[in-house]
């Protein structure tokens, strides 16, 4: 059975939650063994897949979980706004570390390596390709190039202002066009994740609301301070 077919079964049985285990950089939680522990806890709680950044984190996680891992490498480049899996060597390193799916930036922005070249390299390793997109045009272009999974990950992050709510319209547009969509980006409540599924998402990735304690504490502190002012 193909990995996509296996995921279809898991999603039908468990609901389609993917947990992104990416601690705040330099957080006390930003250690491979802690990332792996969070991933294992998420798997035991019913997550159908895990999203992991960084080769060391992926290696540690691969050793303890059996669910599929979506692997990425983030870089801050001087000559490109693209941050997610920008180079061939990133793809190779993630493949060697045990990723099942490799996600890349799928936006139409200046980049060191073309999207189609990165997709071809992912497929060279026999892995599934996911593209993190920001617009319908991004997603449809990546689908035509052969990406099996389209993520709404970068919606709101390629423009000057980032909205507070997730982009359900993008999920629906891409789903209606025949894309296998992972909704991602600002899904901070179970209700929002459920809305994404109702709008046609294949699965939903949740990160900050589950694995970034600093963000969750800030949300509570902000709300509670407003209540007593």
UniProtKB/Swiss-Prot annotation:
Disulfide cross-links: none
Record-listed E.C. numbers: 5.1.3.9
Listed GO biological process terms: carbohydrate metabolic process; N-acetylmannosamine catabolic process; N-acetylneuraminate catabolic process
One GO CC term, this protein: cytosol
GO molecular function: N-acylglucosamine-6-phosphate 2-epimerase activity
Keyword Isomerase: yes
UniProt cross-references to InterPro entries, sorted A to Z: Aldolase_TIM, NanE, RibuloseP-bd_barrel
Keyword entries, A-Z: Carbohydrate metabolism, Isomerase
Catalytic activity: an N-acyl-D-glucosamine 6-phosphate = an N-acyl-D-mannosamine 6-phosphate
Pathway: Amino-sugar metabolism; N-acetylneuraminate degradation; D-fructose 6-phosphate from N-acetylneuraminate: step 3/5
Superkingdom assignment: Bacteria
Induction: Negatively regulated by the transcriptional repressor NanR. Induced by N-acetylneuraminate, via inactivation of NanR.
SUPFAM superfamilies noted in UniProt: Ribulose-phoshate binding barrel
PANTHER family, alphabetized: N-ACETYLMANNOSAMINE-6-PHOSPHATE 2-EPIMERASE-RELATED
Family the UniProt entry places it in: Belongs to the NanE family.
Job description of the protein: Converts N-acetylmannosamine-6-phosphate (ManNAc-6-P) to N-acetylglucosamine-6-phosphate (GlcNAc-6-P).
Protein name per UniProt: Putative N-acetylmannosamine-6-phosphate 2-epimerase
Lineage of the species this protein comes from: Bacteria, Pseudomonadati, Pseudomonadota, Gammaproteobacteria, Enterobacterales
């Amino acid at each position: 059975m193909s990995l996509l077919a296996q995921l279809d079964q898991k999603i039908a049985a468990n609901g389609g939650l993917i947990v992104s285990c990416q601690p705040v950089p330099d957080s006390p939680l930003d250690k491979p063994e802690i990332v792996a522990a969070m991933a294992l806890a998420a798997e035991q709680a019913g997550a159908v897949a895990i999203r992991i950044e960084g080769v060391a984190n992926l290696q540690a996680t691969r050793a303890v979980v059996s669910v599929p891992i979506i692997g990425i490498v983030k870089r801050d480049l001087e000559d490109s706004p693209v941050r997610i899996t920008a180079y061939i060597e990133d793809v190779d390193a993630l493949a060697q570390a045990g990723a099942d799916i490799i996600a890349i930036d799928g936006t139409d922005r200046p980049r060191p390596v073309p999207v189609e070249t990165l997709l071809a390299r992912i497929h060279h390793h026999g892995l599934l390709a996911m593209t993190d997109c920001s617009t319908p045009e991004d997603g449809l272009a990546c689908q035509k190039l052969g990406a099996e999974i389209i993520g709404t990950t970068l919606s709101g992050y390629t423009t000057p202002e980032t909205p507070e709510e997730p982009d359900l319209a993008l999920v629906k547009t891409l789903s209606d066009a025949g894309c296998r969509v992972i909704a991602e980006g600002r899904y901070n409540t179970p209700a929002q994740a459920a809305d994404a599924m109702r709008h046609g998402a294949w699965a939903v990735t949740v990160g900050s609301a589950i694995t970034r304690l600093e963000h969750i504490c800030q949300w509570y502190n902000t709300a509670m301070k407003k209540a007593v002012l």
